[in-house]
UniProtKB/Swiss-Prot annotation:
Chief site of localization: cytoplasm
Pfam families, alphabetized: Anticodon_2, tRNA-synt_1c
Protein name per the record: Glutamate--tRNA ligase
Motif ('HIGH' region): 9-19
Source organism, top-level taxon: Bacteria
Keywords, in A-Z order: Aminoacyl-tRNA synthetase, ATP-binding, Cytoplasm, Ligase, Nucleotide-binding, Protein biosynthesis
Protein family according to the UniProt entry: Belongs to the class-I aminoacyl-tRNA synthetase family. Glutamate--tRNA ligase type 1 subfamily.
């Protein structure tokens, strides 16, 4: 049998990292088994579903490299199929019309709460007579449709992640609403548990891989599979992604959508790699840096943890840093140019390309995210700098003015500054000031960049020298040094 899995996001928001991680596990399992990965958009929430969210979901999956084999299918196009299934359940006597009002149901919940009982529907309209139904209709009530759940029914399945799972029918909240209110003889808008099962049957889904927050839906869905004459698929409920405090990661935690991570400068392969590690342990010898294709070769449910996976920003940044360092120089520059343009930095992409290339190579080793190149690169796109407190302190050292005066006087006029020339100037300036080379380099860095920490000093000096910006910066720093020393 060909393995068929599906991702079924709701377009009520941008692609969430939890949904994306579910997509990763589905994709890995499908590729591992030579199966099919199906994309289905669950857009039955008419009030909250938006086309722009659908577009965001599709773009996010494609950016991550999670290509699908079928779809996207849209549930809003399949309403007739769901209504046929509901009619089948009505005809079999497995579903019925319920005329309870919202006020009656709220009163029932309040009564149960007062008694310390779990809220559940008491199935009071399961056996209405035709006369009782007619009376409710005459009173202007429109019924929902409920699916019968027997309290004494035990539902079990062998979860591919969690092992044997068992639920009692009495714990499922009573008979389940499967269609919204509509006049009798009509079938209202179908609801989640019903449409999911109908689609999974129609699409031949063999394995349902989803987050553990869906585990309470599974027994209800198993009953629906059986009622519709279908064999339930395999189920795998993966651990939730947790925040730093051990709670489920949510929008309140800030960055949670794939488009947010992308905007922050995380690379798609790095993010996909990290999401794979959120709950899955690679076998020995694979390491923590791997492609999706490599992970697919080794993927198994046995290596998925049952406990929640805590989101670790340091780990993500470390992974992203490795992937940034692996980028080819031209590929890396292509990533940075749009960011620099978006930041408003002035340059001519064609004329300045060699200079931009050198700048990109200077920054590449020190970046955790691509977006850090905006701040770290800023000092190279402006003719002058502002000295931070540490730079001011360095320029205030007794010999800084002597160092800067020597460098200014002997600065080469030609546009090319070689490493040898720069090193010689630093050594000579140190000798003239009677200080060590390290102190001279700290003073030079403070003058050129406005800070005492940063990327390779010689490469930074060469880049600034190409634009002729080292001379005015040295002059400004000398003036500052003479004022404070």
């Amino acid at each position: 049998m060909t393995v068929r899995v599906r991702l079924a996001p709701s377009p009520t928001g941008n692609l969430h990292i939890g949904t994306a991680r579910t997509a990763v596990f589905n994709w890995l399992y499908a590729r591992h088994r030579g199966g099919k990965f199906i994309l289905r958009i669950e857009d039955t929430d008419r009030e909250r579903s938006r086309p722009e969210y659908t577009e965001n979901i599709l773009e996010g999956l494609q950016w991550l490299g999670l290509t699908w084999d079928e779809g996207p299918y849209f549930q809003s196009d399949r309403l007739d199929l769901y209504r046929q299934a509901i009619q089948t359940l009505l005809d079999k006597g497995l579903a019925y019309y319920c005329y309870c009002t919202p006020e009656e149901l709220e009163a029932l919940r309040a009564e149960q709460k007062a008694k310390g009982q779990a809220p559940r529907y008491d199935n009071r309209h399961r056996h209405l007579t035709p006369e009782e139904q007619a009376a409710f209709e005459a009173a202007g009530r429109t019924p929902v449709i409920r699916f019968k759940i027997e309290d004494d029914r035990q539902i079990e399945w062998q979860d591919l992640v969690r092992g044997r799972v068992s639920w009692q029918g009495a714990d499922l909240g009573g008979d389940m609403v499967i269609a919204r209110a509509a006049p009798r003889g009509e079938i209202g808008y179908p609801l989640y548990n019903l449409v999911v099962v109908v689609d999974d049957i129609a699409m031949g889904i063999t394995d349902v891989i989803r987050g553990e927050d869906h585990i309470g839906n599974t027994p209800k869905q198993i009953l629906l599979y059986e009622a519709l004459g279908a064999t339930p698929p395999n189920f795998a409920h993966t651990p939730l992604i947790l925040n730093s405090t051990g709670q489920k990661l949510s929008k309140r935690d800030g960055v949670t959508s794939i488009s947010d991570f992308r905007a922050m400068g995380y690379l798609a392969p790095a993010l996909a790699n990290y999401m794979t590690l959120l709950g899955w342990s690679p076998p020995e010898g694979v390491g923590e840096l791997f492609t999706l294709d490599l992970a697919a070769k080794h993927f198994s449910f046995e290596r998925i943890n049952k406990a929640g996976a805590r989101f670790d920003w340091d780990k993500l940044n470390w992974l992203n840093r490795q992937y940034i360092q692996q980028l080819e120089p031209e590929e890396f520059l292509a990533e940075l140019i749009p960011l620099w343009q978006g930041a408003g930095y002035a340059f001519d992409e064609e004329r300045d390309r060699p200079w931009l290339f050198d700048l990109a190579q200077l920054l590449q080793p020190g970046l955790n995210t691509l977006r850090e190149a905006i701040d770290q690169g800023a000092v190279f796109f402006i003719p002058s700098v502002t000295f931070d407190s540490e730079a001011m302190a360095q320029l205030g050292q007794p010999q800084s003015a002597t160092i800067l005066a020597y460098l200014l006087e002997h600065l080469p006029a030609e546009p090319a500054l070689t490493v040898a020339m720069g090193q010689q100037l630093i050594q000579q300036a140190a000798k003239a000031a009677g200080v060590k080379k390290g102190a001279t380099m700290r003073t030079l860095r403070a003058a050129l960049t406005g800070a005492v920490h940063g990327p390779d000093l010689m490469a930074a000096w060469q880049i600034l020298h190409q634009r002729g910006w080292d001379e005015p910066r040295l002059a400004a720093a000398l003036k500052q040094a003479q004022t404070t020393s």
